[in-house]
Amino acid sequence: MSMKMKGIYKGFKCISQIFAVEKERDEIEIGFPTDVKHVAHIGWEGSSGSAPGWMSEFKVGAELLSPRPSSFSNARPSTSFFTSSSSTDFDQGSSQRGISDTLRDIPPVTPINLPKNNKKKSSRRKKSSSSSSSPKSSRSSVLSKSSYKSTVSRLI
């Protein structure tokens, strides 16, 4: 009897969990589209146009930090890396630069000196003194004698 009650209890527990999950789904509130900030505006503190505190460590001109489009029309030349490198890239058209000019801008590559492995792997196995009486070693000794004769004949 206790087994039946345990089975019924587990059944009710599973069913109650299903309804509990359905109830939680109805309670989720989704905000309006105006509540979400655009990715470009994340980090700006209000409409003042000043950069957030965590960006104060970067030394970039103030005209680049301002989110207002009117500030770009009043931009003055800056000595920062971003404006100097981008202005040189856009001042010269890609059709005006030749391949040789592009290759001239690339620094030369120095080769890496790797240590050379002077040891060559031998395909022959070394003879052991204990296996000299076996038929295999006698065959290898015959082969080595023939190779010895051919080497000697080449030298003479």
From Swiss-Prot:
Residues 30-43 form the CRIB domain. It is found in: Cytoplasm. This is CRIB domain-containing protein RIC10. Residues 68-156 are annotated as: Disordered. Functions as a downstream effector of Rho-related GTP binding proteins of the 'Rho of Plants' (ROPs) family. Participates in the propagation of ROP GTPase signals in specific cellular responses. Is involved in pollen tube growth regulation. The keyword Cytoplasm applies. Residues 117-128 have a biased composition (Basic residues). InterPro entries: CRIB_dom (IPR000095), CRIB_dom_sf (IPR036936). PANTHER family: CRIB DOMAIN-CONTAINING PROTEIN RIC10, CRIB DOMAIN-CONTAINING PROTEIN RIC8. Its main location: cytoplasm. Residues 78-96, 129-156 have a biased composition (Low complexity). Keywords: Cytoplasm, Growth regulation. Residues 68-77 have a biased composition (Polar residues). Expressed in roots, leaves, flowers and pollen. GO terms for biological process: pollen tube growth.
